[in-house]
Amino acid sequence: RGLGDVYKRQEVQQIEEKLKTALKPSRYRHTLGVAYTASCMAMVFGVDVHKAYRAGLLHDCAKGFSMEEQRALCKQYNISLEGTLTKSPQLMHQEIAPFLASDEYKEQDSEVLSAIACHTTGKIGMTPLEQIVFIADYMEPNRKMIPGLSKVRKLAFEDLDKCTKTILKNTIEYLTECGQEIDERTVETYKYYRDKKEN
């Protein structure tokens, strides 16, 4: 192991300690679950394991704040509260997280920040790292069993595109059944992966 690995390990430990204080225990357990799952998937798909772990750790770093505090952070970071964020305030944490990860947790890697920025809604043409964090968030071991989760967990280590498409389809169906607002990015992303030709 080189000196770089030691520094990386120390950086990660500092992030973990800070998150443990900032998040509720259940949210912190989920965070670790996403980080571990993302790093395992990264090994399978040849993606940088350190980046996957850090993105998994930081994806929900804004969840420790109340909705009111999240609104204030949106204003601070000039994030528009128009449109879906008005109807689906639970998406605010996704918008805030990249800024918070950079400012409070000193994460400067653009690929990590980009993966954090679309971990809930997805986006058209995601990179493998972005897909890995998106998938890991949905199916990490601490998640309660929901219809279709076993299929997702199998696909997660076989085909990122098929797995992404399945999650988006499940999410849209669930939100429709519950009568909840569906972010247009989620719909657009689903259509993209539904229509994407297999390589």
Label every model-predicted segment.
Residues 30:
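N-terminal glycine-rich anion-binding loops that anchor highly charged ligand groups
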Residues 173-199:
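Charged phosphate-binding loop/patch that engages nucleotide di/tri-phosphates or the phosphate backbone
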Residues 1-7:
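Short, small-residue-biased leader/transition segments that mark boundaries at the very start
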Residues 25-27:
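A short, charge-rich alpha-helical start-of-domain segment used by transcription regulators
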